Amino acid sequence: MKTIVLGPPGTGKTTTLLNEVDKYLKNTDPNRIGYFSFTQKAAYEARDRAVEKFNLTEDDLPYFRTLHSLAFRTLGIKKENVMQKKHYEDLGKKINIRLDYHEYDNEYSGIFSTNSDILRIIQLAKLRSITPERQYNLKEHTQDVSLRDLLIVSNEIEAYKKEYNLIDFTDMITQFVLSDASPKFDVVFIDE
C-alpha cells in the first residue's frame, strides 16, 4: 500500500509518518524499516523523535537517514574519495575553464550547488541517465554554454575521477543501486 502525505513545512507530515512507523513497529523488526529524508538534519530529527516516542536507541533505528548516507555507509565509501570543491577547482585550473562549484550543502543531502550551467547540465544528464549532449539539446540552461566546452568538461571530470579514484554524489547512488547491497525492508518511509 502506498500512502502519500502532502503539506508545507510545519503541518505534521513527519508526525503522521512516525504514527505510521508506530503501527509497523508492533509487528516489524526496526532493522526492516527504512525511513529516509532529504537532509541529514530531517533524518536525525525523525530518528530522535522515534527514539523518544518508541523508547528505542539510535542503534535500534539504523535506517533513519538520507539515501546518500545509506549508500556511503553500505558501500564503505570514505569522504576523501568523494569529489569536493578543491577537486573541481583543481580540474578547472588544469583545463582552463572556471568550474564554479559550492560544497554540497551542510545537511549532506547530496544537493549539487553551482552557478555553472556546464556543471548543472552534466549533473542533470547523470540524474536523467542521458548524455550531456542530449541534456544540452533540451535547452534548459540559462547561460551561453558551448557544446564543445560542455563535452570537454564532462570528459575531463570523468578522467579526473578515474585518475584520483573519486566519485561524486550521483555516482554514489548509482553504485549503490548497481551493487544490490540494499538492506531488505518490509516498509519504507520517504520524508522529502
Say what each PLM segment does.
Residues 57-61, 66, 85-94, 144-158, ...:
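SF2 helicase/translocase NTPase motor core
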Residues 2-5, 16, 32, 103-189:
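Accessory N-terminal region flanking or inserted into the helicase ATPase core
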Residues 49, 53, 70-74, 90-100, ...:
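Residues that form generic nucleotide/phosphate-binding pockets
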Residues 1-80:
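P-loop NTPase Walker
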Residues 192:
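Catalytic glutamate of the conserved HExxH
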Residues 81-109:
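Conserved phosphoryl-transfer catalytic core
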